[in-house]
Swiss-Prot record:
Residues 342-365 have a biased composition (Low complexity). Keywords: Cell projection, Ciliopathy, Cilium, Cilium biogenesis/degradation, Cytoplasm, Cytoskeleton, Protein transport, Transport. Residues 177-274 form the Rhodanese domain. One of its GO terms (biological process) is cilium assembly. This is Centrosomal protein of 41 kDa. GO terms for cellular component: centriole; centrosome; ciliary basal body; cilium; cytoplasm. It is found in: Cytoplasm, Cytoskeleton, Microtubule organizing center, Centrosome; Cell projection, Cilium; Cytoplasm, Cytoskeleton, Cilium basal body. It comes from Xenopus tropicalis. Required during ciliogenesis for tubulin glutamylation in cilium. Probably acts by participating in the transport of tubulin polyglutamylases between the basal body and the cilium.
Length: 365
């Protein structure tokens, strides 16, 4: 009876919980802090989506950083174009202000209705404008209102709306002026026509093998230019890393590679950044590709559009995806901060109680 028998099974802590493959993809919503499983999952994700190598000559840029850069460039170009439009409109209004006669100008000034804005506008502009502003009743304005009937006025407004829609569609066909980055797609032409990032230009990696003129004039313009960078990308960093290494060896210092390529873009920004349909290798993991192709029907492949700017809908989608990612990353940190703040009062009260007891025990000097 010298040997003591333990209560229960000694191997109970080593027993593993059986996992159900049906719910294996579901993650817990409870943040339990850092753990070895999370660390291993992060390493597996890095190995799956990224191809890091030692002593890389080129620099990397994250997909989220690139999305923020796109939003900034779009906002700055929009403000710049709106400023140019206002100056052009003011110049046009100043040129058309000669339509009003001097007597009408003096009568408006004496009646107290004249203002810098009203003085520069002509009666024709008041008639053609769609805004609900009051018209200046002059002989020329009444004559113009008689000449142009209601039907003619509506037709003119519809023509103006069509012109605005054509201008908005034509604006997407032009790249941003003074864009700080040059985005290059180093895949072949067929892959580029299927799917690419909006504003990217096709530069196949085979161009680097040329002995004469391997770089386009745009690449030479952005090469080591102050305040400008060149960004390369592909599907999974296989081609882009080789192209970036070759270009860095040839003297490019402002070269970046988009980390993850289209594979990470399809996961983080499925809509907004790209045009066309993603390749199958970007949507389905390579291990599950065959089984998934057998089960799920093939979606129709949509070719990429020839647009060089992001529309307002694209920018809204990019902002929504960024906000969702920021919210998902900020919630665990907020929970940790709340737990820390809840612990602070208890520690402070204990410190106060200790200081009060020590002050009572020690004599006052």
């Amino acid at each position: 009876m010298s040997a003591k028998r333990s209560i229960g099974d000694s191997e109970i802590l080593k027993k593993r919980i059986p996992q159900n493959l049906k719910y294996q993809h579901i993650k817990t919503r409870l943040d339990t802090g850092n753990s070895m499983t999370k660390y291993l999952e992060k390493i597996e994700e890095i190995k799956k989506n990224y191809r890091y190598k030692k002593d890389e000559l080129f620099k990397r840029i994250k997909v989220t950083t690139f999305a923020q850069l796109v939003l900034q460039v779009a906002s700055v170009s929009e403000e710049r174009e709106s400023g140019e439009m206002t100056t052009d409109e003011l110049q046009r209004l100043e040129d058309n202000s000669s339509v009003i006669s001097d007597t009408e100008f003096l009568t408006d000034r004496t009646n107290g209705k004249g203002s810098p804005v009203n003085d520069s506008k002509s009666p024709i502009q008041f008639i053609d404008s769609e805004r609900g502003e009051e018209c200046i009743h002059t002989s020329r304005s009444t004559l113009q209102s008689v000449i142009s009937g209601v039907g003619e006025l509506d037709l003119g407004n519809q023509a103006d709306k069509k012109k605005e829609s054509l201008q908005s569609s034509s604006a997407l066909d032009k790249p941003y002026e003074d864009c700080p980055f040059l985005l290059l797609d180093v895949r072949d032409r067929d892959s580029y026509d299927q799917c690419h990032v909006v504003g990217a230009k096709n530069y196949p990696v085979a161009m680097l093998s040329r002995t004469m003129n391997p770089f386009t004039p745009e690449i030479l313009e952005y090469r080591n230019a102050h305040g400008k960078i060149i960004i390369l990308y592909d599907e999974d960093e296989r081609i882009a890393s080789q192209a970036a290494t070759t270009m860095c060896e040839r003297g490019f210092e402002n070269l970046f590679m988009l980390s993850g390529g289209l594979k990470v873009i399809s996961q983080k920004f499925p809509q907004g950044l790209t045009t066309g349909s993603f390749p199958v290798t970007c949507l389905v993991p390579p291990t599950q590709m065959k089984s998934a192709l057998k089960r799920t029907p093939k979606d129709p492949i949509v070719p990429a559009e020839d647009k060089w700017r992001f529309s307002s809908q694209d920018l809204e989608m990019i902002e929504n995806h960024l906000e969702n990612m920021l919210m998902s990353t900020s919630t665990p940190s907020r929970l940790r901060m709340d737990s820390r703040n809840s612990k602070v009062p208890s520690s402070a009260s204990s410190a106060r109680s200790q200081s009060s007891t020590s002050s009572h025990s020690k004599p006052w000097k």
